[in-house]
Design a protein with these regions (language model features):
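Short phosphate-coordinating micro-motif centered on Lys-Gly-acidic
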Residues: 61-66, 72-132
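Hydrophobic anchor at the beta1->P-loop junction of P-loop NTPases
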Residues: 7-9
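Short beta-strand-centered segment that lines the nucleotide-binding/catalytic pocket of NTP-utilizing
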Residues: 30-46
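The conserved Walker
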Residues: 13
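Phosphate-binding P-loop
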Residues: 1-4
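Conserved glycine(s) of the Walker
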Residues: 16
């Protein structure tokens, strides 16, 4: 993952979206606490010169709520944005590099990953190499 990336996380409540974000942050080297942004809408983390924004739009009722948040300013070359419940703001997102769908399945979960940009394809290739 690198600056300028947007990753969306879809799945029902309890599918593990926030848990996955915790794992991503740990993989990037974050050692502090990782909170769910369900009530705050966004939690942010700073890695030297890289910002990491974790959004949760579950509580958004109307996509127009986006206009009053200032969140558009978070999508920049020096940031990574990971978005839970992206379908609530899909029309407002500038692009999506990687889309992740989590599903509950016995005895755990399934994960579907898809890339929509060259940066997303590179990210998924690096991920595949890590788990191979």
């Amino acid at each position: 993952m690198g600056g300028g990336m947007i990753v969306t996380l879809s799945g029902e409540l309890g599918a593990g979206k926030t848990t996955l974000v915790r794992g991503i942050l740990r993989g990037l080297g974050w050692t502090g606490p990782v909170k769910s942004p369900s009530y705050a809408l966004v939690e942010h983390y700073l890695f030297s010169s890289l910002y990491f924004y974790h959004f949760d739009f579950y509580r958004f009722e109307d996509p127009d709520e986006w206009n009053s948040t200032g969140f558009a300013e978070c999508f920049r070359p020096d940031s990574i944005a990971v978005i839970e419940w992206p379908e609530r703001v899909a029309a407002r997102l500038p692009w999506v590099d990687v889309a992740v769908r989590l599903k509950l399945a016995e005895p755990g979960r399934t994960l579907e990953l898809s890339a929509a940009t060259e940066a997303g394809e590179t990210c998924l290739a690096q991920f595949a190499a890590l788990i191979a």
